[in-house]
Amino acid sequence: MASDAPPGAAARPTSAAWTAVYDQVRELEGRRYPDAVVARLPDVPREDPFHAEWRCRADSADRLVHHLAGSPMPLEIVEVGCGNGWLSARIARSVGARVVGIDVNVREIDQARRVFGSVPDLSFVVADAQLAGSPLPRPTTIVLASVIQYVADAPALLRRLLGWLPPGGELHLLDSPLYRPGEAAAARSRSEAYYARLGVPVMAASYHHHEVGILDGFTAEFLHDPDALGSRIAARLPGRRPSPFPWIRIRRPAEADRSARDR
């Protein structure tokens, strides 16, 4: 698995030129799927070159859906950086919540609408993560799956999105690498070499290697830690493919909690 260049949708303030570069990379990687394949994601044939990665994405999606389905309150969910919409559709079908998927990539939003347009309580909007909120319903829950690595200032984006949530609302980060202190430089070099081999070296400047420290100052909890003993044991079991990336829940504090913290 090429963990330094994982699959996913870009959701960062960007120009049409940057989106074109992103699309070029996905074409060269062979990650552009026809509608019939997108409709079945995350299930892909064994012969698909990214079969192992999609098994990991299925694992993280299952965990997320199980968590959301157990909510005691009605949910309004926004997936930021939804790409072709497969995860938004999975959530809408399984959780019984209203779901809005947003992405800056017009091509991917068009495909999401074609493939999943008939799913109840699901819609897709071309929108920038930094501008999210104005024309959209206020969510109780925000999902960023394989997104944060395309954002240069991750803490600023997290603060902005948390401000869009009500007190107690949840933001979920998943399917993105977060590095221990000292690991990011080597990962950055691997990504630069990867995009150079692919023939699109400019993409390396937009693929960011965040350390766990970006979570400092947030009310963050690891709901899946791939480095935990139980996760490492599960990864060795036959037939299992747990996600190698963490799943992190960040809550917007209740106003009373925030006031106490600020004193």
How would you describe each model-predicted region?
Residues 1-45:
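N-terminal, positively charged/glycine-rich alpha-helical extensions of SAM-dependent methyltransferases
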Residues 141-154:
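A short SAM/SAH-binding and catalytic strip from SAM-dependent methyltransferases
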Residues 203-223:
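Short alpha-helix
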